[in-house]
Amino acid sequence: MNIKELENKRIAVLLSGGVDSSVVLYELVRQGLQPGCFYIKIGPEEEEEWDCSSEEDLEMATAVSHKYGCKLEVIDCHREYWDQVTKYTMDKVRAGLTPNPDVMCNRLIKFGAFHEKRGHDYDLIATGHYATTEVEETKEMVNGKLSNGKLKWLCTSPDPVKDQTDFLAQIYDWQLEKALFPIGHMMKEEVREIAEREHLVNAKRKDSQGICFLGKINYNDYLRRYLGELPGDVVELETGKIIGHHKGHWFHTIGQRKGMGLGGGPWFVVKKDILQNIIYVSHGYDPETAYKQDFPIMAFHSINGQLPPTDITLKIRHTPEFIPATLEPIANSKEPIANSYMVHAAQPIHGVAPGQFCVVYDNRHHRCYGSGEITV
């Protein structure tokens, strides 16, 4: 974070009530900057359904903003969230896919709806994401003349466990241009130490887990509310024998091990027949069903317009590991299908599921090119 480049910038800080965004505010204020502070409200549809963690989030954000002499403004993006992110999630789950609502929340809400409501008044939007950026000097032709240009890249955090580039891999180039990650170069332990040293009210607060708006709401209860239940059979893949029953295929994802309620396990979900409403499970001893090494990704979204190279690393879920792979453009009648690739991973990957985002990085797992949806 170059303070010289930020001196004359109007900066909006998105406070969530957590320790990360609170340290973001501290980092900016200690360098003499006066950012605007905002809390985005995206809670459940009815106010009475807000749990204590949602109320606590706002209380924490208010306390931290006041500590540094900033006024906190609450921005209601509840309707946009439920109209866009929830619809995306329910449509995907109903179709038997495995979506990631937090990925779309960043694109559609934090850097989308918020920008439309208040973010457009600011040059930069600062968040507590563990990610970094870098600017590459480029050469480009403008009106027949060679001109200097700049290309901004989304890059990984030095903390592999906390790195959140996978959650940011669907944002647009203009959103990346406005993004500022003041703690992205830090390790989580360092952020905690700063919070404790500065006596922040949430210094010892646990990190949030799961989908950003649910708080303590159970994800299956959330699905049940919008999709209901649809009982069906659980079948052992190898034998075709019915060994149990489920309450709806949308409650289960490929690779899932827990929550099946079956004896004699462990059992893994390896396949879903959406039309017949059948969940297929296996003990995981068949690598051809439990693991995949080659799979297609469609509608690849490039963050800054740069196409990924052949040799890459990737993630299909939020883990510290990056898997080496190669990308092969998918062709149809000798013509490439726009933004579609066949992934050839260097090793079999467990739990590859349709609807997941495959996040693509360079072979040093430093620069993030973007992500595409797996369509196994």
Annotate the PLM regions.
Residues 6, 126-132, 137-140, 149-376:
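AMP-forming adenylation/ATP pyrophosphatase catalytic core
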Residues 1-169, 180, 196, 269:
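ATP-dependent adenylation/nucleotidyltransferase module used to activate substrates
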